[in-house]
Every structure is written in C-alpha cells, then in structure tokens.
C-alpha cells in the first residue's frame, strides 16, 4: 500500500480504554495527547472527525459507583453526566490550539431513516467546510439495547461512509491485528496488511477486548468490512504510540492497514441500503429472477415475486430471498405489501405492468446483491 497524497478527510475512532486511567476515569493526559495529534493533522490540512467513546467512563464515579456499571439505566445515567464533562474537556483543549469542536450525538435510527441520514451528512459537511472538528458519540443516554449500534467501531465505520471519508483510523490498546491473541500467546504475529476479510482473518479476531470498553477485535473487523466495501482505507493501531495519527495517514505507522483491492466500492445509496436501512419485510423470488438479481442484471418485476412476508410500505427496504429462503439481496420497493398481496390490488398492478413495462417492483439501481 503506497501513501495517498490525495487523502483529505479522516475519521478517527478512539475507545474508552485508550482514554482512561488505571482507575477507569478519563485521563486528561491521554486526552491532551490525542488532541495534540488531531491538531497536527488539522495543521497539515486534513479534515478530522473524531468518534470518541468515554462518556460512561467520565461519569460513573460522579454517581458514586466504584467501577463501571453493567445495568443499562446506570450506564445511561453515567453517560448523561460524562458526555458533558468529556465535551468540556475536549473543547478547552482544542480551543487552546485555535480550533472549535462540535458535539454530535447519534442514534441508530438517525441512520436507518434515509431523510435523517442525509440530514446528518449535510450537517457534518457544513461543519467540516467551516474548519470545525466534529466529535461524535452514540447518544447512550436515550438509546435502548435493541436500537444501539453495538459499539463505536461500527458507528465510526458508518460515519466514514456517510461523509465519504478517505480513511478510518481506529485507535485501541492493541497495536494491530494478530494471527492469535498476543495477550495470551507470545508467538502471535501481527498482520501488516489486509485486502480481504476472509474467514481465516475473522478467526484471528478471537474475543480480544478490554474491560473498560465494549468493542473487541471482532467488532473492529466488522467496522473495517463496512469501510472496505465503501472504498475507504482503514488502519488499526495503538493509541499511545508516538504520532500514530500522522504516521497512519502517511502509511508509516506500526499497525494493520485495511484496503479492498480490485472491488468496486458501494455508492452512497448502496451504502445506506446495505448497512443502515433496516429491512422491514421479505419477498420470495422465482429462480430465474433470483439469478438475475444475484448477478445485478435486472430490476425486479411483478412476475418475479412469488411470496411476501411481513408488512412494508412503498419506499421501504426489504430482503430479497430465493426460493430456498436464502437472502440474496436488499432493495427499495415501489409498492407496499398490501398492494403486492391483496388480489384486487395485485390485479391492478398486473394490468399496469402490461401497459407500462417500467412498472417494476424494485429498480436495479436501488437494489443490492448480497455477496
């Protein structure tokens, strides 16, 4: 992988374990070190988006807890205190260098709704054009488990795709991806570069992670899958390594680089369908139609739909299934489940299709085969 001199927009994700002291509280020294590195990139002309964990870690002791709580209400209460404290610290440190930081708290529903998804992107672009440093975190105080991103690794990857970033840098307490767990296996070897996340690469992830954060190595690989599919480079390295950010964007850092080679990246619409939309139902397709959809050769017409499962509206994203029940793709439908199921409604659509050859159920431009 050679240095990319055209790189401009970088998303940096840092986890709780890289921001806290041995006692689990936010370390100002570590925050200062991170801010100094972000400032160095800003001074060099880069746009930087920071996805920062640490709200719960910053707040739980203020509630009288001795260690990080496990129950959701206690974690959310901790985050409600800690997020403000964390942003106050970031703002002061960036202002000392002449930069303004903004806070963006996101929930998964902000990404699953396409209108809100586009609105978040537009807001971030304005901030970046004005030289602001957006600091992003999941809105832990109001998010319930079933609607969470899971961890900030996933959030960072989706943010990178949202704003067409050139690179995602994930800073952790481990200096890259190994072929085993380096904490328990001294013979484990670091993998310098990954061009495809294969089952063998996934097997290397194990369950390595820290007790302070929520994201282990497996979640990081899932994040890099997203950015690689979106045509974005990735890097995983150790947060406390000297000048890690500057060296990472110049392809000179110690860690693991991720880059998809020889694949066509997903466009914005395809990214939203694949990673954010949240399918609402299923359509079982004929064998001939399934084959064409899998090969990206055709839109989905009425005669290719054999069965409908679930309820959905026109404009919803649904799963496209073959006759064996295997998911073969996702698509935005032009008709509701009611229109496609009720005899009178379906007859009306059939008559329309006989007149209008473009009366497709799902256009090829708004469908995505699952590989």
UniProtKB/Swiss-Prot annotation:
One of its GO terms (biological process) is L-proline biosynthetic process. ATP binds at residues 13, 172-173, 214-220. Its EC number is 2.7.2.11. It catalyses: L-glutamate + ATP = L-glutamyl 5-phosphate + ADP. It comes from the Bacteria. The keyword Kinase applies. Keywords: Amino-acid biosynthesis, ATP-binding, Cytoplasm, Kinase, Nucleotide-binding, Proline biosynthesis, Transferase. The keyword Transcription regulation does not apply. One of its GO terms (molecular function) is glutamate 5-kinase activity. This is Glutamate 5-kinase 2. It comes from Bacillus subtilis (strain 168). The lineage of its organism: Bacteria, Bacillati, Bacillota, Bacilli, Bacillales.
């Amino acid at each position: 992988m050679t240095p990319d001199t055209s790189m401009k927009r970088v998303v940096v994700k840092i986890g709780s374990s890289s921001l806290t002291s041995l006692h689990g509280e936010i370390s100002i020294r570590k925050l200062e070190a991170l801010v100094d590195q972000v400032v160095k990139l800003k001074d060099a002309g880069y746009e930087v988006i920071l996805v920062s964990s640490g709200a719960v870690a910053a707040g739980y002791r203020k509630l009288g807890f001795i260690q990080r709580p496990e129950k959701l209400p206690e974690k959310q209460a901790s985050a409600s205190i800690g997020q403000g404290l964390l942003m106050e610290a970031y703002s002061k440190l960036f202002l000392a260098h002449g930069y303004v930081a903004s806070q963006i708290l996101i929930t998964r529903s902000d990404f699953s709704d396409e209108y809100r998804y586009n609105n978040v992107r537009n807001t971030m672009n304005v901030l970046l054009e004005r030289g602001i440093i957006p600091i992003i975190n999941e809105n832990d105080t109001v998010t319930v488990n079933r609607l969470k991103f899971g961890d900030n690794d996933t959030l960072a990857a989706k943010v990178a795709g949202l704003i067409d970033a050139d690179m995602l840098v994930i800073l952790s307490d481990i200096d890259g991806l190994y072929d085993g767990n380096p904490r328990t296996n001294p013979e484990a070897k670091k993998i310098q570069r990954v061009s495809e996340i294969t089952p063998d690469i996934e097997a290397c992830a194990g369950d390595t992670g820290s007790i302070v954060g929520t994201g282990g190595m497996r979640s990081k690989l899932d994040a890099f899958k997203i950015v690689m599919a979106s045509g974005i480079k990735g890097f995983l390295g150790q947060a406390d390594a000297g000048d890690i950010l500057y060296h990472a964007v110049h392809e000179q850092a110690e860690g693991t680089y991720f880059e998809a080679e020889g694949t066509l990246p997903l466009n914005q619409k395809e990214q939203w369908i694949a990673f954010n939309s949240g399918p609402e139902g299923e359509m079982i397709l004929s064998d001939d139609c399934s084959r064409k959809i899998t090969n990206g050769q055709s839109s989905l017409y009425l005669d290719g739909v054999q069965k409908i499962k679930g309820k959905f509206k026109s404009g919803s994203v649904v799963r496209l299934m073959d006759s064996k029940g295997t998911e073969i793709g996702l698509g935005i439908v032009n008709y509701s489940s009611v229109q496609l199921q009720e005899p009178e409604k379906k007859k009306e659509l059939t008559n329309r299709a006989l007149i209008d050859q473009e009366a497709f159920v799902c256009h090829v431009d708004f469908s995505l085969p699952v590989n």
